[in-house]
Design a protein with these regions (language model features):
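Gly/Ser-rich "nucleophile elbow"/oxyanion-hole loop immediately N-terminal to the catalytic nucleophile
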Residues: 1-33, 43
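Extracellular/periplasmic catalytic domains that process cell-envelope and extracellular macromolecules
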Residues: 20-22, 43-47, 64-68, 132-142
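Hydrolases whose catalytic domains are alpha/beta-hydrolase-1, hotdog thioesterase
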Residues: 37-41
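A conserved short beta-strand
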Residues: 47-58, 71
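Active-site nucleophile loop of the alpha/beta-hydrolase fold
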Residues: 53-60, 77-81
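C-terminal catalytic histidine-bearing segment of alpha/beta-hydrolase fold enzymes
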Residues: 73-75, 101-197
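Acidic catalytic loop of the alpha/beta-hydrolase fold
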Residues: 79-84, 152-154
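Short, flexible/disordered intra-domain loops and linkers
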Residues: 83-91
Length: 198
């Protein structure tokens, strides 16, 4: 109830005179415990966010998992806590990815070979992996993972633009009955190129 009350209060108070918010583009992010909370809400309450992107903690399937589409990105550090530095061999990352791939309707494994896209974002993130779903002829990256080189359990400034570059392409609308419609835009909504996530 807190989330719904907070958003309702913000919608009532933010009228554009001081600030303006696009309530169709609410994103979740965080590091460490913040990442665990964000990814946890993505599992249990995906209706909170248009997309999530976080660093250094994962979530997995829970008893109250929603199994609904939620675009997600996770970055781990090469010297991070737990087993995350193991990458594809990490149990925590495997559990996170298994849930997220299933929730997003992608029938693939969390392996480098099964990733649909593999690219270098910058010198700290030379290996970014994406699992996509083709919707109306557009390859939509719904699950993305990267390892940040030489990073312990913290955030580097280079992590944040990567998370934003992922999340900014997604939006959502909530109908009166609570139905969620999600959108992906390759141009980050600068052009009329949005496709509905099905």
């Amino acid at each position: 109830k807190f989330y719904q009350s907070l958003v309702t209060l913000m919608e009532e108070k933010i009228d554009g005179s001081y600030a303006d918010l696009d309530f169709n583009r609410i994103y979740g992010s965080g590091q460490s415990a913040g990442s665990a909370a964000t990814q946890g809400f993505a599992v249990t309450n995906p209706e909170f966010f248009a997309a999530v992107g976080s660093t250094s903690a994962a979530a997995a399937e829970k008893e109250n998992s929603a199994f609904e589409t939620i675009p997600t990105m996770l970055i781990a550090g090469q010297m991070d806590l737990g087993d995350m530095p193991k990458g594809f061999e990490s149990t925590s990352l495997q559990n996170w990815a298994k849930y997220m791939l299933k929730a997003n309707g992608i029938d693939k494994e969390f392996t480098a070979e099964d990733a649909d896209q593999h690219f270098s974002a910058d010198s700290r993130h030379p290996d970014v992996y994406s699992w996509t779903k083709t919707i109306d002829g557009v390859d939509v990256p719904l699950v993305q993972w990267a390892l940040c080189l030489l990073r312990p359990h913290n955030c580097y400034p280079s992590d944040m633009p990567m998370l934003w570059d992922f999340m900014e392409h997604f939006s959502f609308e909530k109908a009166e009955d609570g139905t969620i419609t999600r959108y992906y835009s390759a141009s980050a909504f600068e052009r009329d190129d949005a496709v509905i996530l099905k």
